[in-house]
Amino acid sequence: MGRFLLWCGLLLSACSGPSLLVVGEGVSPAPPVPELEVVVVDHNGDPIADARVDFGGFDRSDTGSDGKVTSEWPRRPVTIEASAAGFHPSSIEVLDLPATRQVKVALEPVVVTGTVTDLSGKAVSWAAVSLGDVVASSKSDGSFELVRALPGVISVSRAAFEPASLEWDGTEGAVTVALAPRTVKSVRAGGSAAGDEERWAELLRLAEDTEINAVVIDTKDEAGIVFYNTRVETAHEIGAVSVKYRPEDLLADLKERDLYAITRIVAFQDTFLGTAFPELAVGDSALGVPWKTDRGQIWLDPTDRDSWTYPLALAEEACALGYDEIQFDYVRFPSDGPVDRATFDGPSDSSGRSVAITSFLAEAKSRLNSMGCAVASDVFAVVLTSTGDQGLGQQIEDLAAVVDVISPMIYPSHYSTGWFGFDCPNDHPGEVVGNALDDGMPRIPGPAIVRPWIQDFTFGCGGSYGKEEVRSQIDAVEERDLGWILWNVGSRFTESALEPGE
């Protein structure tokens, strides 16, 4: 009995004493698994998101917005391969885990290079080029680059030209896209006509029912009137604004009908601005006041660059509003008055006149092409046939280099006896238009497009103008693969002379 008690006491004593083995004692934690971070960047060093990274075949992951992805280091040399949409794949060999535990893989983009030209092969600048989400603009030499390109359709558009496209299969190499000139068949809506609901509706119906595919709307006319509530403060300050329409409404009507939208801005005949700021006007050497035409209109001095500010501001606003093309009228030196008394700030000899006008239009083209608008210049028809600038600064060869469209005003009624061998040129509308174009077109190198104004009104010698006379002019123009614009001061046109719409 005593032995039993002793044994039990020893047992209890042992159970109450310290343990001989502590759980986990002497077991070290497993070392952390090393990781390698891969940063995928483009040729500029910027991170590429959504790039696929292959870690030697044992792991694949996509980069985040920071271009980074991490995976376990396999404790052996590994080939890291990276690829991304619009880039050439690339790889690097990693022999040992770097101290920074980071490597960088640079991908070179897939680049499509090309050139935009007209049908004759002349470069076309400021064309919008797109391939999926990748966009670019053609440069002055017509060249463009599409970076990060994927196979698909290359689309090219440019105001004054028809859009074009081609399928690109992903093969690198230069491509050429040739644009055909847009064949415009247009009428003109004066400010009052555009602002009259019935007259505007009639012009839209005319376009819907006939071959008309464009409309010219006056922004500023020969009297200097601006026909909408412009944000160009100068127009309000000089009292030139007479609100007739909302351009947003007119443009919406044109876009709804897929009609090409042109606005006409009279550049240098402006009595409002010349009266308010006589220092911008042509001077009169005899009277010491601004020079005036026989009809009392003041003319701005084209050699004074300050006189350019106002018409260019209106042009930029018109382009921003959504017009496709900005057409400058009266973009010349003055006529129809005592021009021998006209004085200018800058050179006004033949060379000086040409430099002033071409410089103004070049400035307009520089500003407006970059905004997506074409630039057109109206010119006297006489400059197509006669050499020199005819005192106007409209040297046709020089103008062709600085505008997208040249619109000679070929009105048979404005030709005097003897022109083209006719006693009354007005009685030979088709022949007059054809002869004038044949004289001038060889002198107008591309990519400038020739698009004449032609006559839809009765004036001068001969009979009245109607279906036959208007159609003969249209036919003469179209035989030369050109578009045209009908002029009528009241915006009332001879519908019977027009072909039905498609």
Could you tell me what each predicted segment is?
Residues 79-94, 155-166:
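A short, solvent-exposed loop/turn motif at the edges and junctions
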Residues 16-35, 98-111:
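Beta-strand-rich domain onsets/edges
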Residues 262-270, 327-328, 353-392, 447-459:
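Aromatic-lined carbohydrate-recognition surfaces of secreted/lumenal glycan-active proteins
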Residues 403-417, 429-433, 439-502:
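Substrate-binding cleft of secreted/luminal carbohydrate-active enzymes
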Residues 32-49, 114-126:
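Structural motif
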Residues 47-70, 123-125, 133-147:
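Short, acidic Ser/Thr/Gly-rich low-complexity loop/linker segments typical of extracellular
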